[in-house]
Amino acid sequence: VQDFVAAWKADPAKVTIGGGSSPGGPDHLFPMETAKAAGVDPTKVNYVSYDGGGDLLTALLGNKITAGTSGLGEYVDQIESGQVRVLAVSGDERVEGVDAPTLTQAGIDLTFTNWRGVLAPPGISDEDKQAMVKVLEELHATDAWKEALVKNGWSDAFMTGPAFESFLNEQDTRVETTLTDLGLV
């Protein structure tokens, strides 16, 4: 990680970072926030947007980009075969079976997760909302949920109600700040 950051600081435009999302998406926001935390000017980051993980992997394996950002679950086979090397993981904890530090352990003060949520339309009744939450809580308690977390290298960040609402507000602020810093908002 230190060698990568040193090269990035020396010439941010030369270090190409690929991601499977358009500007504003998680694969774009992550390297921008990483750059800022590592002391690289995010406006100088050379981000290449690909149409999903398959195109990103092709570019990475073909040496068209310096590094890529994606979920571990998308590239398990390539990681296990040694075709792709994980420099760091962006969650709070190391991922079991992956020989890579967290960004924080590597000296970059950043945690970044690509979360998923279940949202309902405005005006949903309290009864329907509680029924949805109950189903999600039941799913969360299953072995299948736990197995999916391990299989995909995901962190269990399950939350509902006010905790999830607070998280969404924090995410809105974080994204707006990053996009504003980049001059995109």
Protein language model annotation of sequence segments:
Residues E74-A141, E170-T173:
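C-terminal lobe and pocket-closing loops
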Residues D11-V15, L61-S70, Q83-V86, T173-R174:
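Alpha-to-beta junction loops
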Residues N46-T58, G71-E74, P162:
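Short helix-initiation/N-cap motifs at beta->coil->alpha
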Residues V1-D55, W115-A148:
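Hinge/capping helix and adjacent helix->loop/strand transition within the periplasmic-binding protein
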Residues D3, T58-A59, D77-Q78, T102, ...:
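Well-formed, non-transmembrane alpha-helical positions, independent of function
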Residues A38, E80, T102, D126-V185:
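An extracytoplasmic/periplasmic, membrane-proximal ligand-sensing/linker region
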Residues V1, G68-Q78:
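Ligand-binding clamshell of periplasmic/extracellular solute-binding protein-like
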Residues N63-K64, Q83, G107, G153, ...:
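Conserved functional loop/turn residues at catalytic and ligand-binding sites
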